[in-house]
A protein has these predicted regions:
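Bacterial Sec-dependent N-terminal signal peptides
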Residues: 1-26
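Active-site segment of extracytoplasmic enzymes that catalyze sulfate/phosphate-ester chemistry
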Residues: 41-131, 150, 154, 160-165
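N-terminal carbohydrate-binding accessory modules
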Residues: 23-29, 58, 63
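Active-site-proximal cap/lid insertion segments
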Residues: 26, 38-52, 68, 72-75, ...
Length: 320
């Protein structure tokens, strides 16, 4: 059994759908899909979280639909994203694990073949502008699995899911070209900036904005821990090896900060949609790719991150 993932849909899913059904000439709704990385169902206030503040997502849940029987496609990143974008059960999907392959440009995940159709390709045929920012994980640059060859007009972020463990990367990809950051930029901030800019530029016609953001996946790395710095008893996570996750002296504060950052981002998206006058014609969906992780210093039991369910990421139980 797979993870009960987090899926929230705003009230506008219902209102927009009803209006479109009633009026043949209605404008197609915009679609915003925010996919968190390794977030547990219990990490949000609307699912019972008491220690981490998520007011924007909680409000979205209050006014929308709260899914309690929705399962992710897999217990790890790449196959879950493959199922999400192709609509296929993992048993029929092309990508069924986080297996990677080497190329001249680096180490990337298995790439989707040309005959695999994504939801972005379908929406693009219907006149949608399409975007993916964040983690891709379904193929490297200049392959059939590149996002710009799978229906996305614009991509910015990590093409390799394995590279997305580092929040201060050497580079990110814009479409299929490297953008050098030299390990000096917190990637998530730049990824969100690019995604919001896409909405600004495309507010005049239907769009599909897929925010495949990387928090709260380990590394537990966030530049400002002040919101939760002294809120919890901490057990430092120390890794002196060259491989593995980054040392974090306050892992609980870091994890909570990353979850609250995601909540802030959802608020930013909603505010921008309001400013552009398109909120009432936009479907907003929030989910996680799989269950909560328990690496890099994160203690899921402290936050009750998996809620009432058994297991964590990689486990074949509903918490994973």
């Amino acid at each position: 059994m797979m993870n009960k993932s987090i899926l929230l849909m705003g009230t506008l899913l219902v209102s927009a759908s009803v209006e479109i059904a009633a009026q043949k000439n209605s404008e197609n709704p915009n679609i915003v899909f925010v996919l968190a990385d390794d977030m547990g169902i219990g990490d949000l206030g609307c699912y019972g979280q008491k220690k981490i503040k998520t007011p924007n997502i909680d409000k979205l849940a209050e006014k929308g639909l709260l899914f309690t029987n929705h399962y992710s496609g897999s217990t790890v990143s790449a196959p879950s994203r493959c199922s999400l974008l192709t609509g296929k059960h993992t048993g029929h999907a092309y990508i069924r694990g986080n297996k990677g392959i080497k190329s001249e440009e680096g180490f990337f995940d298995l790439h989707l073949p040309s005959d695999e159709v994504t939801v972005a390709e379908i929406l693009k045929r219907k006149g949608y502008a399409t975007m993916c920012v964040g983690k891709w994980g379904l193929g490297g640059p200049h392959t059939t699995g590149s996002p710009v060859k799978k229906g996305f007009d614009y991509f910015f972020g990590y093409l390799s899911q394995g590279a997305a463990h580092r929040y201060y990367p050497e580079y990110l990809y814009e479409n299929e070209d490297k953008v050098m950051l030299n390990k000096k930029v917190y990637s998530h901030f730049l990824i969100m900036e690019k995604g919001l800019d896409f909405i600004r530029k495309n507010a005049g016609h239907p769009f599909f904005a897929y925010f495949a953001i990387t928090p709260p996946h380990a590394d537990l790395d966030y530049p400002d821990l002040s919101q939760y710095e002294d809120a919890f008893p901490e057990t430092p996570y120390i890794n002196n090896k060259q491989k593995g996750f980054k040392t974090q002296m306050k892992p609980k504060a870091a994890y909570a900060s990353m979850v609250s950052e995601i909540d802030k981002n959802v608020g930013q998206i909603i505010q921008l949609l309001k400013e552009k006058g398109i909120l009432e014609n936009t479907i907003i969906i929030f989910s996680s790719d799989n269950g909560v992780h328990c690496v890099g210093g994160h203690e899921p039991d402290f936050f009750d991150s998996n809620g009432p369910y058994r297991g964590y990421k990689r486990d074949l139980y509903e918490g994973g």
